[in-house]
Amino acid sequence: MLKFVVRGASSGLVMAALLLACRGQGAHSAESRPVPTATPTANASATVAPALDEAGPSMDLLRSGALWHLYREGLVIPFAQEGFRKYSQEYANPWRGLAKIDDQTGRTLGATAATLRFPWDATTGEARLIVRLHGGSAGKKLSVRLNGRPIKNTTLEAGWQQVVMPLPSGVLTKGENTLALAAGKKGAIFHSIEIAPGETLPPQQPWPATSPVAKVQLAGKEREGLTGFSRLMVPVEIPQDGWLVVDSATLTGPARLRISVAAEGQPAKLLLDERQAAGTVRPRRLSLAEFSAKLVALEFSVPEGSPADVAWLAPRILLPKAASRQRPAPAKNLIVLVADALRADKLPMYADTRVRTPNIATAAAATGVTFTSTQAASPSSPPSHASIQSGCMPRSHGILGDKSKVNPGTPMVSAILAKSGIATDFVGDAGFAMNRLKPVSTWNEFHMPGKEGKGGDCQAVVKLMLDFADRQEGKRFFAAGVAFEAHTAYIYHPGTTEHYYDGPFDDAIGKRPDGVILTAIVGGRLKMTPERWGQLKGLYDGEVEHLDECFGALMVGLKSRGLSENTPVILLADHGEGFLEHGSMGHAYGQYAELTNVPLVLFAPGLGHGQKISAVVSHADVVPTIVDLMGLPTDPRVQGESLLPMILRQGPWIPRVMPSEYGRSYSLRSRNLHYVVDYGGHESLFDIAVDPAEKSELKDKRPLALRYFRDLAGIYLAHRAHWHAATWGTLNNHLAGFAPAKE
């Protein structure tokens, strides 16, 4: 018999499980949620798993405990665990730290009101809302509204208490629901909220555990798992060729165990439905190949037996082992060229485009690594350039908008490299973005060619970077340049622009349309005809082709100097450019894909060979990648992580979700989906795999995807300023160092 000792869970947890077992209750009653009707795949648990990559990229479903939705009879929201963030997406966080009183722990409401949004999948209407909290001092008022409907006004006692509120049929909505809490005074401490089906409260219902993660003793060994809840559900993106790996343990009694997977709009498919004898541990290796690249609801449940008597040990999603190419020798030098306002869909590695970029395309096929899903840190230059140079997101480096200043102590790639004796150089007329970074940067040379009378063309940028390389006389160097070709004004290039528009040139648009003209178009003061649109877009496309000529000159210049083999080049954009796809032009007007989906290509002989990587990456990953390529340790303040391991692995990678922000707006990007919250808090959801122009709004059609991104948005909003990918993981895949987990 296995000995079971729970650590890290409240004593009420075991009592709850025993009570449920005595009452004969399983994971969920018929009124709470129907059991999946699908039968198990015949060989679901018998399929022989390939050699799995235990040390490689994986999804740690245990460390991501905050992402699981917890159920007893109904949904449980425990405030003492970071998982409650899934239900709180308010821009101004009303919640404060933890408070422990009389052996119970809760979270303090630091405002007089808070809003929670939660999913509901029950099949009947009548339910009850159970609020467990500490009033702080007697006499506080608590008012509750659900989906805009008043539920109850109550006066709180001084200590811990349980307030039960019947919910009439029709108040709860299948799908997303909004719960509004209003308190007359600050300081109430919330332990948990439970939304359960049925009218009556079972007698002596104990309070739920504050976390699904607990340590158990198995045959004298301590292991960690998910336990204590009859049903656990997590929205998760399944990687290509992924395998679910988990050990199911039954402790003092037998239990029936289920594992199911449900893709959006599809019936749940049972991967496991089995009775497991008491005191046993069964390793489970379940193929998820059928769900590759899909967002699914993964569910562990205990339909029969005590939930406290079952532990799901070390649940993970692993990939098959894959070959990995040898890590290259440290690059001697490195160059970054940022093409301001360059749309990803203007390069042939990203889309079928009319724009001619033979130099970029040829180099990408020969020595390039193209990241096809790159999320800009921001749709505006100052925040994005700061992220490209620092490896941090806007909330961390401090430049949230166009007027912000950099936070003191922000790491900068120029300073990191200079400490190792590497000469650093910046070239570009990007003073609007780059001048504000000077207080924390270390540039040996800083050139603004237009202001220096050397021309504002990208040819001048390339020449000055190559001149800087010449002056190093064999010493290590790093050069960063900004080319303005795709930014307004869109300049006419004789013999190039004609590839896309050969006239006549309307004076209303001219041959150098700037931001004033774009504003006039948006405001309706400049009426656009098909010919004028052709002229405007032809000028932009001609600028991109001219940029390609400059890129070609850079690569030829490096080769002629004998530097091409040991000088990787990174080409990327700070943001994209809009042409009325969503009611505006230029950039900085929103978080849509034409602005935040940007190109990122690494050109490195011996490392790149034309491969494309579809895992989502970020501007914040650029600095740690630069430092890693040059053989140096990453500054611990950097928030992103090196992309070199992703490049070296000759196989799929784990799904990642990356953010972008600008002022109060933000967006979250997965490989196929894009969740956007605008300046006013309005949500949008797009499937960019089938709708790259983001014309079809899916928020009300894809409930699982909406819940997935709301979950991640709550975590993101609470911790974006301090996120550290190397130790915390990504928003959708947490690591052991995820600091709030220690609360």
Ranges and model annotations:
Residues 1-12:
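Bacterial N-terminal signal peptides that target proteins for export
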Residues 10-21:
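Bacterial N-terminal signal peptides
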Residues 110, 114-125, 167-171, 230-242, ...:
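Extracellular and analogous surface-interaction loops
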Residues 125-147, 179-181:
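Aromatic-lined ligand-binding clefts that engage carbohydrates, nucleic acids, or primary amines
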Residues 140, 161-163:
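Basic, alpha-helical nucleic-acid-binding regions used in initiation and control of genome expression
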